[in-house]
Design a protein with these regions (language model features):
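Basic helix-extension-helix modules of the SAP/HeH family
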Residues: 1-49
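SAM-dependent nucleic-acid methyltransferase catalytic core
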Residues: 51-86, 135-255, 275, 286
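Short helix-loop-beta connector
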Residues: 91-97, 235-236
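Short active-site oxyanion
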Residues: 94-98, 117-118, 216-220, 273-279
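SAM cofactor-binding core of SAM-dependent methyltransferases
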Residues: 96-161
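Short His-Asn-centered micro-motif
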Residues: 100-102, 122-123, 222-224, 243-245, ...
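Short loop/helix-cap segments at secondary-structure boundaries that form the rim of catalytic
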Residues: 112-115, 213-214, 232-233, 287-295
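Long, positively charged, glycine-interspersed low-complexity recognition regions
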Residues: 259-321
Length: 321
């Protein structure tokens, strides 16, 4: 937020609103400095998730997401929901349709359904797409199949991982995906190692209840290349695109086979998304991506990530001019 445009009285009001102390007797520039410092330190709690919120002026407190993803997902945005939703409400209010070309774990997308949005989700990774469509169409059977396979062992983990790309039965694919996701170190399907701690603490009855509670009634799913997906959805005044592409360099899980697809073409996707008017893209912060989007607005953000929520992720949110 640009505090320089506000009067000293308005700045004092903001200090009182956001609990900023030490402003009494200060000059305007000093008060702005206090507000900027508070912006960096401000945190929001969503359940067990602590979110660093860098923009007081766009702060939205989310006390419950209500519709929570059952998946652990590398680079997932569970802890960024408050920040992302603040950018949506500030820059793209009243949107009714959200397009997600990289649905992934779906944390933000599912949150947006609680705000009245219809979500069209897409993911190129077949097992993940299969998990979501199976959860949507036959969640009770999926939950029962997972229970039958519990508990997970290291040997079973290895067997499921080796067979998931060859399996043709959708229910078996979805079951395997969920079990691998809940018991790998990072939530990655094909590149995260087995974690006994995760197997004991994250593949539980409560995780299955979380799966059953997931409401996908306002979501549709497709299994397309991201550019093709956007081409299938012409822009309307009600539509917003939220894209969370694979990180530049560390592109671990994008692709129909979930391979290490360093071949994802970030430049092509940038060209595709910039043809539209209303969109938000989140990326890891690096010079290459900044150069691709140099004709756009770029905001630096940080949110916590990892199993202990103590690491900070340096990311950027990109919006059209």
């Amino acid at each position: 937020m640009d505090y320089s445009t506000k009067t000293k009285e308005e700045l004092i009001t903001l200090c009182k609103k956001y609990g900023v102390k030490g402003y009494s007797g200060k000059k305007k520039a000093e008060i702005i400095s206090l507000l900027n410092k508070k912006s960096i330190e401000e945190t929001t709690v969503i359940g067990e998730h602590i979110i660093v919120n860098p923009v007081i002026g766009e702060h939205i407190t989310v006390t419950s997401t209500k519709n929570v993803s059952p998946l652990r997902y590398p680079g997932g945005k569970t802890r960024a929901i408050s920040i992302l939703s603040s950018y949506v409400s500030t820059h793209f209010p009243n949107k009714k349709v959200l397009l997600s070309p990289f649905f992934g774990g779906g944390s933000f997308e599912l949150f947006m359904t609680t705000k009245g949005c219809t979500v069209h989700g897409n993911d190129l990774f077949v097992p993940l797409y299969t998990f979501w469509t199976t959860t949507q169409s036959d969640c009770d059977t999926l939950a029962a199949a997972i229970k039958e396979q519990m508990p997970m062992t290291k040997e079973k983990f290895r067997t499921l991982r080796e067979s998931i790309l060859q399996e043709n039965d959708s229910m078996k694919v979805a079951t395997s995906y969920f079990m691998i996701n809940r018991t790998s170190f990072s939530g990655a399907t094909l590149c995260g190692g087995y974690s006994q701690q995760a197997a004991e603490g994250r593949l539980t009855e409560s995780s299955i209840e979380k799966l059953k509670a997931c409401n996908l009634s306002a979501v549709t799913f497709t299994n397309l290349d991201a550019n093709a997906f956007l081409d299938c959805h012409p822009e309307t005044t009600d539509t917003l695109v939220y894209a969370d592409p694979p990180y530049y360099i560390d592109t671990y899980i994008y692709g129909k086979n979930g391979d290490m697809h360093e071949n994802f073409n970030h430049a092509t996707f940038a060209d595709t998304i910039k043809k539209r008017s209303d969109w938000i893209v989140s990326y890891n912060d690096c010079k290459y991506i900044r150069d691709l989007y140099k004709d756009c607005r770029i905001f630096e953000v940080k949110w916590s990530y990892g199993m202990n929520a103590k690491k900070a992720s340096s990311e950027i949110i990109i919006l059209p001019l």
